[in-house]
Every structure is written in structure tokens, then in C-alpha cells.
Amino acid sequence: MVTLADVPADERVIVDGTLVATGNRAGHDGLYSGKRHAAGVGIQVVCDTRGNLVEVAGPVPGATHDARAWFALGLHERLADRLVLGDLGYLGSSDDSTGCVVRTPVRKPPGGELSWGQRVSNYVHNAIRAVVERAIAQLKKWRVLSAGYRGPLSRVGEVIRTVVALEKLRTHPWPL
């Protein structure tokens, strides 16, 4: 199983957030994600450049923006002194105090267009980031995450950690 300690310090890691559907629950505010038009909890998925699942942080309420979850879950401290690739949801997430640098694609200026070089840079950036989308898709193959979690919200974090451990064992079985 690959952990953050196994990833060389000079290798970049890739981060992305996803929503685990839970349905709307009485007494739990902030679960509805306006971006995804669904209620659930958000998780932050970290993988290496080969697509190996390194870490999953969370859960946070589904309405929490990726950049806010990044800081709330302490990923900026755990990934200190590393180059991290993220999407536009992580704009402004670099942390000078820990040395964590989050590279994001170049954003199109209002009323303007990107130059050819910026478009190529974004293309390469997104091609590298595709592995984290694949890692999320592999996680979401587990029925408890794909069909929506229907158990008590107090245990959703435990269920997510269990699924992550099982997925790591599935992709990297222990040598016998």
C-alpha cells in the first residue's frame, strides 16, 4: 500500500475533491452542494503521479469549497514542502508558512482569451491531473460511495476510511 511517506519528497502529488452522496438529512446544515446539486459530504483525494491512492481526507460538509476543505483538513500542513497539482478550485491554496505550493491551471481573464502557451500549459496540467480523476472513479466503484451513503452521518468518516483501505489493498495487495 502506498502512503505519503512512500512518495519521494521531490515528486508532485495531485489533489481533488469529490462529493459522497448522503441525501438531505434533518438537523445537518451545509450538506447541499450547489455546484453538484446534491446533498453529501466532501472528501479530498490525494494520489501520486502514477495514480496510486495516497491519502483521503475528510469528510467535510458538501457545501464546503475545495480550497476551504484543503485548509480545514490540514492538507496544507501534511503536504508541506511538496509540489501539489490541483484544479481551479484550489486557487490561492499555496501556503508560504509550510512551503506547500499548489499549482493550478491558468484562469481565463474576464472578457479575454488565453494565449497559445497558456492553453498548452493548461492542457499538460490537466493531462497530468487525469490520474486523480481515475483514482476517484476507482473509489466510487464501491457501492456504499456510488449509490449514496444511507447510514448514520456520525459514521461516514469511518466508512470512507474503510473503503479507502480496501481499495488500497485491492490495487496493491500485500506480497505473500
Write out the residue ranges for each language-model feature.
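Short, well-ordered secondary-structure "scaffold" segments embedded in the functional core
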Residues: 1-176
